[in-house]
Design a protein with these regions (language model features):
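Nucleic-acid nuclease catalytic cores
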Residues: 70-104
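Mg2+/Mn2+-dependent nuclease catalytic core
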Residues: 51-75
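Short, conserved, surface-exposed binding loops centered on an aromatic residue
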Residues: 26-27, 36-38, 74
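Acidic-basic catalytic patches of nuclease active cores, encompassing PD-(D/E)XK
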Residues: 1-26
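Short His-Asn-centered micro-motif
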Residues: 25, 48-49, 83-86
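Intrinsically disordered, low-complexity terminal regions enriched in charged/polar residues
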Residues: 92-185
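Beta-rich catalytic cores
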Residues: 31
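Conserved catalytic cores of phosphodiester-cleaving nucleases, focusing on short active-site segments
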Residues: 35-37, 41-52
Length: 188
């Protein structure tokens, strides 16, 4: 609600290529993440966290969750993500981070290049730093893009050009040319 018009427009691009979003049974259990996003070209789990502090350190159960997501990502060739909400922020309060997974292919690999990894503490433990994450509206705009979406957009643009510009010109030419009208009558 408090996002700018630009942020809202970028986020709404996802409506062109939506996902089926499933709340994982036993959310918070190891390896599943809280949400599973599914679409024909890509699938990924998301672990959701929120805090009033910009930095959220993982420890105990949350480190085990991270390690389980890492293991599932490796075994299943999936790219898990964290969605981190900073409470009390106006505008886009969500930031996206990825769990580091090696050997991804296809769209998962492209997506992994765009999203920052969870930073590490001095002792190597991952944590969430809101300032270092990718804003949710940018993440949504990126995953909404695809070749088929671009093709749909270009086909729609071509139809619009034809219907708004070319078709009226053709109709105008057909109706204003006496030779055209006479030849079309003699052909019938």
């Amino acid at each position: 609600r408090s996002c700018s018009e630009s942020e809202r427009a970028q986020a709404m691009q996802i409506c062109q290529r939506p996902f089926l979003v499933v709340r994982a049974p036993g959310s918070g259990s190891e390896g599943t993440g809280d949400l599973l996003l599914l679409r024909g070209d890509i699938c990924f789990p998301i672990e959701v966290k929120s805090s009033k502090k910009k930095k959220l350190y993982l420890s105990g159960r949350t480190v085990l969750q991270y390690q389980a997501l890492e293991e599932i990502g490796r075994r299943c060739s999936l790219q898990p993500f964290y969605a981190y909400r900073l409470k009390g922020v106006r505008g886009d309060s969500w930031r996206i981070f990825r769990v580091k997974i090696e050997g991804l292919t296809g769209k998962s690999r492209l997506l992994a290049r765009r999203v920052p990894e969870l930073p590490l503490t001095r002792n190597g433990t991952p944590y969430l730093d809101w300032d270092k994450g990718l804003p949710l509206h940018k993440f949504l705009a990126f995953i909404a893009k695809s070749e088929s979406a671009k093709n749909i957009e270009s086909n729609m643009a071509a139809k619009k050009v034809y219907s708004e510009i070319l078709e009226p010109l053709i109709n105008q030419y057909d109706s204003s040319s006496p030779d055209r009208a006479a030849s079309s009558l003699s052909n019938s």
